[in-house]
Amino acid sequence: MSTVVVKGNVNGGVQQPRMRRRQSLRRRANRVQPVVMVTAPGQPRRRRRRRGGNRRSRRTGVPRGRGSSETFVFTKDNLVGNTQGSFTFGPSLSDCPAFKDGILKAYHEYKITSILLQFVSEASSTSSGSIAYELDPHCKVSSLQSYVNKFQITKGGAKTYQARMINGVEWHDSSEDQCRILWKGNGKSSDSAGSFRVTIKVALQNPKYDSGSEPSPSPQPTPTPTPQKHERFIAYVGIPMLTIQARENDDQIILGSLGSQRMKYIEDENQNYTKFSSEYYSQSSMQAVPMYYFNVPKGQWSVDISCEGYQPTSSTSDPNRGRSDGMIAYSNADSDYWNVGEADGVKISKLRNDNTYRQGHPELEINSCHFREGQLLERDATISFHVEAPTDGRFFLVGPAIQKTAKYNYTISYGDWTDRDMELGLITVVLDEHLEGTGSANRVRRPPREGHTYMASPHEPEGKPVGNKPRDETPIQTQERQPDQTPSDDVSDAGSVNSGGPTESLRLEFGVNSDSTYDATVDGTDWPRIPPPRHPPEPRVSGNSRTVTDFSSKADLLENWDAEHFDPGYSKEDVAAATIIAHGSIQDGRSMLEKREENVKNKTSSWKPPSLKAVSPAIAKLRSIRKSQPLEGGTLNKDATDGVSSIGSGSLTGGTLKRKATIEERLLQTLTTEQRLWYENFKKTNPPAATQWLFEYQPPPQVDRNIAEKPFQGRK
């Protein structure tokens, strides 16, 4: 058998299907090969760089609303010596248009975190004066009130305020001001002073778009109910301080100036420390009455004041700095009390004033001194009233008098004058904005503290406001404070200057600086005003220039003259207590006091001089012998035995038995024991004034003709 190989027509033979399969496999392989690719090593890194670039482009293209911080610098040029003005930081800062009209309109909220105030001096070396400046963190003050911080005109200076000092901790709306700096110079208007350079750092957040033009009005939505107006709440709390000089506690003290006082200021939920003005309401050589000013914003306010008067002193030198070394007591006169008055256009109404005091125990001893002459430890008060302020104004608070004499000095004694810090009591003033229909300011009378007693106080719930209105042009430093002559429905006038009380009842006049008081009513009201200035008294003729004149006696003088005979059976304090218990009015208390005074005066017709003491028989016999025959002959023997004398047979020789009394001694014989004690104490502090008072003193009512004819022989 042989094998046949066909080489010609392959496609036509049995090998054709196999060839087709090979061709299809070759074509399929050619189609798959182009899909397979080798990736270059650098391509993934290029792709990541492109993604990073995209992220940066997205971050810069889409704002996220974050805040920013900017710094602004502006100047106030061409200042003269007596320049004055203010910087109000916020939308009212007209001295910096870039801040006011620029970036501030592009944000909803801002806060100034730092203020650098620099004064660049341009004055000549011969110029004098300074520029005082003050920070107002709440934009409540319209004029400079504190002169503590100053720039010298010839030197210049700088002051930095941080966020906590300028109310810059919290964010503020871009439409409200944050704080204010006020300044005022005391130089000449013709002298060039320099300029201010101010640098502020501002933080901003929540940007907004401001096109500068008003948008077209949109359809008005359905009106919503008007929210109730927020009632503001303001409080002042603090202890006024005063520097005094004292030496020994049996000597008088010297008072320094009051100046500015520092107290805590609370408004709604915010609080900080602020300064307010204080000065003396009146001052004399015997006492000084302090006065404090408090700001009142525009509106109607209900004011409640709590005063706890206590005057401890403390040392100002090491090693006992700040330690208590005694106190200054209060007088027991009814002319000393806490009271309020109007200032700067405010109107006070519905005044309610309750004053109390605490007496010292007679056996209480402080620095070897006792409380046996009516000195008081404390004087407290609770005062409430309504005040209406058409614009921002002030009212003032008057405290009890600070006594300067040794009678009220309970400090440690030193050999020389030393400075002491004295507290004037705790004062709390609360202002609650009063809106109609809210029922605010419903006052409930507080009961007196344990051991305290009510006293006469200015009290007129439905009457006119207080009449004390000190003005800048009125010299209030030289006159004495007026006592209130109107008895309230709580207490009487007992113990006042005109009531014949202990030492405070004496009326003294020593020229302009006088402690005398007088009755005064103004415009039909019962409120005391500041007395008008008086001319100095004419010089007195030395020697015995006293004259005896008849005058209408008063009930108080009669009671002091003979307390046993002119006692009506009940005191003025009893009238006050009965009026309080019966809830009587002012008229009821006044009528009862007038009736009591008439009862005292009616007793003058039955008054008789005190009967003479019984005379012993021996003295009566000598008097009868002297009338019948003169004493002649005999001697007074020094060595004679007791009871043996040669009167009647001897003579008196040599010397005088009794010297002639001086005019001053005869005047002193007319004083009562209480007046003599007061005179001796007053003579230690001011001998010339004590002598003048002695020669001007008028004797009590002349109910006995013998005393009227012979005033220098004293009482029998």
Swiss-Prot record:
Region Involved in the efficient long distance movement of the virus and the periplasmic subcellular location, residue ranges: 694-698
UniProt feature, compositional bias: Basic residues: 18-30, 44-61
Classification lineage: Viruses, Riboviria, Orthornavirae, Pisuviricota, Pisoniviricetes
Keywords linked to the UniProt accession: Capsid protein, Host cell junction, Host periplasm, RNA suppression of termination, Virion
Family of this protein: Belongs to the luteoviruses readthrough protein family.
Site (Cleavage): 443-444
Basic and acidic residues bias spans: 459-474
Highest taxon of the lineage: Viruses
Keyword Lipid metabolism in record: no
Region (Readthrough domain (RTD)): 210-716
One Pfam family from the record: PLRV_ORF5
Bias kind Pro residues: ranges: 216-226
Feature: compositional bias, Low complexity: 1-17, 645-655
Cellular compartments per GO CC: host cell periplasmic space; host cell plasmodesma; viral capsid
Polar residues bias locations: 475-502
Protein name, UniProt field: Readthrough protein P3-RTD
